Amino acid sequence: MKGDGNWQPEYREQAADYARRLYWFHRYCGEDGVRVHTVLVNYGYGESDDERDFLTTTRVEKLAEVIERFDQPEAAQPLSLERFLSVDACQPSPSLVRAVRSYFSEHALPRIKRIDQVTQKTVARVITEIRETHATRKRKLLLVSGVPGAGKTYVGLQIAHERFLDDLAEMGESDEKPTAPAVFLSGNGPLVEVLQYELKGAGGEGRVFVRGVKDFVEKYSKKRSGPPPHHVLIFDEAQRAWDAERVRLKHDDPTAGSEPEAFVSFAERVPGWCVVIGLIGGGQEIHVGEEGGIGMWADAIASSETAWEVTGPKQFESVFEAKCVAFTASDDLHLSESVRFHFAAGLSEWATGIVSEKPDVSKLATIAKELAIKGYQLRITRALREAKAFLWKKYADLPDARFGLLHSSRDKRIGDVIDLGPRRRFGWIGPWYADPEDSPGSCRRLAQPISEFEAQGLELDHTLLIWGTDFVRTEGFWDDSSARSYRSKSGVRDPLQLRRNAYRVLLTRGREGVIICLPKFLTELDETFDFFVASGCEVLN
């Protein structure tokens, strides 16, 4: 109901959205259920009715007539209010689930490589563990670890879209099985945005199997909420889960526990059985409140009154045994081969060495030389314009290639290097990664940089990293004294370590190469430039 007598485009879009979202995300309102239509009524509206998919616009004098036109009990079985509002009704419609699964299996996701030959053994082991948990009707924490670029995200997405889970699902409160028994959850907002943007071709805005952790926790932590309609909860970058202090701050709930505690609680409410899959990376804790690591999951399991089973790579065994939690070790659940960079075996080791407390320059130079022989390009420059020109020429005949600007979120001088422009609109990350160069928001324009927060978990073919003054070499040591400071209430335990992790992420986003730019006018970067040259970087041009 609108009362201003005007028709703004956003009025129509907002109203149509209500119907579309019910069509997609209400199990009784999709293609297989009752058709939902929105009627947008405006007082003072004088034009004739406008009818389109999902939406009719009319004036108040004709509202009764429009409602009568939609009163067609012979066309479909009426839906009772009780059924419409049932706890487990808010699930994607079966037709949408079918469409998204088909889309995922038939379409390549440009930012997520299909690497079945490397991940096949791990996926098979995860499926076996899920089937066993269903058969024994238990609760299980399954940990899947891997080096950067090993395919953890792909494993999680593949499991989330598996059709066999339909056969294992249990009846919910409405005596019906969940339509989407698994969900891929990530606290990495940009990753969620990009995945949803690239999956939206199937409908449902790409949100059927991919959701954000924060919203999920907020929804199912409410006292009146039912159990999650999923038997498999896939937590991406589980080592970065928020501790209790961070959850309380972000959810404004003084009694909240940690995210691992929340997921243990959710799993115990799911009918019959549930598997929580934690995808584990390392050295990527770049947010405040993420520094507790895998130990929080051991604490959450140890404090539960329900019998849990934990299976994962042997490297985590001691963490759980220290909490008296039984642990089954399996090397099948560790992805040791990086496939993100087909030229770049050794890049992760080089980047880790670069940001370490005591870098071995001679060893780093040797690794850089080996990378160059394999075809990976580690270049350095003090001229941003030359670096941009190099990338535009390099990829001029490869329109599908992706290259872009990166920077550190704590660099106070970035505004002196490049114009960051106006405040970005919501939803800009998906187009930044996916859109072609003629789109103003495309990464290929080399106009807008992304930070470690937008880059983590994602990749480009080539990156141009603007090195900041927040992490510089000073008399042979890394120095973060010029970094933009954290708020006093942020609870940061080790800001220098967060800078190390951030730059490690920034250095490892390119599949084929990285150009590191240390602007000439920033003389405080002189020693850092010399350090990179000594560590094996080739000076551009």
Q: Which positions does each model-derived feature cover?
A:
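Conserved helicase/translocase motor-coupling segment
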Residues: 156, 286-291, 312, 316-477
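Conserved lysine of the Walker
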Residues: 152
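Conserved RecA-like ASCE ATPase "motif II neighborhood" in helicase/translocase motors
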Residues: 202-269, 447-451
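Signature of the SF2 helicase/ATPase Hel1-core->accessory helical subdomain module
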Residues: 235-323
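C-terminal accessory regions
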Residues: 275, 448-541
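Accessory nucleic-acid engagement/destabilization modules that flank
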Residues: 1-93
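Hydrophobic anchor at the beta1->P-loop junction of P-loop NTPases
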Residues: 144
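N-terminal pre-P-loop "Q-motif" helix
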Residues: 108-140
